[in-house]
Amino acid sequence: MSSEPSTTGTSPRTPRPGAQKSSGAVTKKGDRAAKDKTASTLPPVGEDEPKNPEEYQCTGVLETDFAELCTRSGYVDFPKVVTRPRVQQSSVPSASTSEKPVLDDQRPSASCSQSSLESKYVFFRPTIQVELEQEDSKAVKEIYIRGWKVEDRILGIFSKCLPSLSQLQAINLWKVGLTDKTLTTFIALLPLCSSTLRKVSLEGNPIPEQSFSKLMGLDSTIVHLSLRNNNINDHGAQLLGQALSTLQNSNRTLVSLNLAFNHIGDVGAGYIADGLRLNRSLLWLSLAHNHIQDKGALKLAEVLRPFELTHREVVERRRLLLVKGTQERSRSPSSSRYGDSKAEREKSQTLGISNVTLVDKQEKMQSLKAPKTISKKKEKTGEVVKKEEKLGSGQSPTQGTPKKEDAAKAGKGKVTIPEQKMSKGKATKMGAKEKRSILLESEQLVVEATEMVNPLLEPVEHRDGKVFLPGNKVLLHLNLLRNQITEVGLEGFLTAVQYQVQVSKPKTSPKAPLGLLWLSLAKNCFDPQCPTHVMIQELMLPRDPVKAKAREEEAAAT
């Protein structure tokens, strides 16, 4: 009996072989976990180098470049670049298919319904919609961002990937929450983009500072600008009017400006009219759906007919005339050599002095045919140099060639001389592409030449001691739909339209401005059948190019 308790007492003290194995297995598992942990902390081969977005070279494919730059910048959940969907005609479902009941076995499962639900909400995720060129499926033509806030981070990435898009033509930002800071950043990246970028649309982005006029700076290349639904008030209209033109400078690139659906009143319309006084590039202007009444309408109509110059404008006109007269005198044939370089002037002076000395020697040897002119030349040394240069250049054929070169150099800036140079010097060097685009370039040169002439230098009319400048005949399209204009404002537009119709009748030059071709005054505070409105429509109907073309097609068909 004593042996049994001894056996029972010693049994728990002796270690079991199974327990030793289990503890050994635990230690092995712990060592393995530690090894795995240390192995997981080690960086993989090839990923120890940091990815710097500055080192990335854009390929010109916006989808690839934008995703790579966002990844390198640490941007995880970034918008995707997708192709803008085309507007398709919705097909009406048939009655047989719409009336069929949905059976229980035909209903989607839980997984299918979840995936379909996610696909539906993908529409609301931020995306960058692009419109591609038809010839090149990867070349982005237009960019559309709609309904999500664009921050400085995204604009910084755009500043790196947008310059590589060689075919980019338009950027459209609709309700993207722009601020004055982000607008400044956006304007700074526009010069980095391709020269093909001509259209910018910022709609639904109200900014308290009303700083949209920064888009119309002197160095801006924007041709078409849309600022609809931005809560632009009279203060914003004042900034936009000053961006259109002032006494010192004017915008020469903007062709169309859309200011519809804003809060511009009579005061703001007056500021826009002041900008149109000396602006000769804007062709298309929309002020529809604003708060313009008769006072603002009369200010706009006044610009379209001869208007009186203010005192400051008269003073500036006199200054410009003085500068123009000085330039014309400096470009005259007698003093054309003074426009050349210093070396050429010194050379011409030495040639003139040598000619004078030769004439003096010949006077001592023999009498000349024109002694009176020579005696006059001796009295004034400056006239001696100029006239003897002409005499020397006319005596020998070798001196006649440099005279033509000097005349060509002195005539730089004129219209005729560059045409001669293009026809002689560049005709043999022109390629096929240059020949193809020569008409477009010539049209651009003509437009630039007309724009470069300051409107204050146009022919004026003096009446009752006042100076009147011809009205703005460059503006072709004016939209004043849905404002608060009455028949009082209509009278002003009737006078302006009658003047423009009378002036544009004698077509002396095909390059002359056509004047107003389209005017919309519908949905205002007057009867559409009132005599003034009917008369305006009758005067504008033959001038509308769209309706005139339709009438020509109908006449040709009959």
Curated annotation (Swiss-Prot):
Sequence ranges of Polar residues compositional bias: 86-99
Recorded coiled-coil stretches: none
Signal peptide: none
Keywords recorded for this protein, A-Z: Leucine-rich repeat, Repeat
Region (Disordered): 1-55, 86-112, 325-415
LRR repeats mapped onto the chain: 196-216, 221-241, 253-274, 281-302
Basic and acidic residues compositional bias, start-end: 28-38, 339-348, 380-391
Keyword DNA repair: no
Alphabetized InterPro entries for the sequence: Leu-rich_rpt (IPR001611), LRR-containing_protein_71 (IPR053040), LRR_dom_sf (IPR032675)
Alphabetical list of Pfam families matching this protein: LRR_6
Start-end of Low complexity biased regions: 1-18
Protein name: Leucine-rich repeat-containing protein 71
